[in-house]
Structures are given as C-alpha cells and as structure tokens.
Amino acid sequence: MNATQTQPQNADQQSVAATAKEQGTEARDRQPPLHPETPAPSNTPRKDSLNQFASWLRQDARAEATTYLHRANTHHDGE
C-alpha cells in the first residue's frame, strides 16, 4: 500500500454494511401505493416567463419601429 491509499477501519465497514442492509430491507418491504397521486402541473412559472418574453418582444418592436420612423422622417435620400 502506498502513502496515498488509506485502509478503512473494520468497525466503520461493519456499520456501513449494516445500515445499507437495513435500508435495503425497508425499501423491499415497502409496497408502492395502488393509485399514486400525480402532481398537479404548474404552468405558472412557464406562463410568467412567456408573458415576460412577449412583453420584451413588444417593447423591442416598439423601439425598432420608433427608430425606423424617426430615420425615415429625418433622412431624405437625394432631397
């Protein structure tokens, strides 16, 4: 064994093995519910983010239209 490897203590190994065995037995003995309840879909965060995105698009489109109209009204090619 080199200096970087460590050897676990025997007592720790036994307690970890016993805990794992107990947890495995509990999980095996537990029965799944006959009719599991499905969680209610939560559309609120998604809806809010879509509304925010739509609002941002409207603001951006409004700013672009304002800039376009200003340039069209103030810059006349050849006149």
UniProtKB/Swiss-Prot annotation:
Q: Write down what this protein is called.
A: Prokaryotic ubiquitin-like protein UBact
- Show the cross-link location (Isoglutamyl lysine isopeptide (Glu-Lys) (interchain with K-? in acceptor proteins)): E79
Provide the GO MF annotations for this entry: protein tag activity
Residue ranges, compositional bias (Polar residues)? 1-17, 40-50
Which keywords does this Swiss-Prot/TrEMBL entry list? Isopeptide bond, Ubl conjugation pathway
Where does the record place the region Disordered? 1-50
Q: Which family does it belong to?
A: Belongs to the ubiquitin-like protein UBact family.
- Superkingdom per UniProt: Bacteria
Q: Give the function comment from the record.
A: May function as a protein modifier covalently attached to lysine residues of substrate proteins. As this bacterium does not seem to encode proteasome subunits and proteasome ATPase adjacently to UBact, this tagging system may serve another role than targeting the modified proteins for degradation by proteasomes.
Q: Which InterPro entries match?
A: UBact
Which stretches does UniProt call biased (Basic and acidic residues)?
23-32
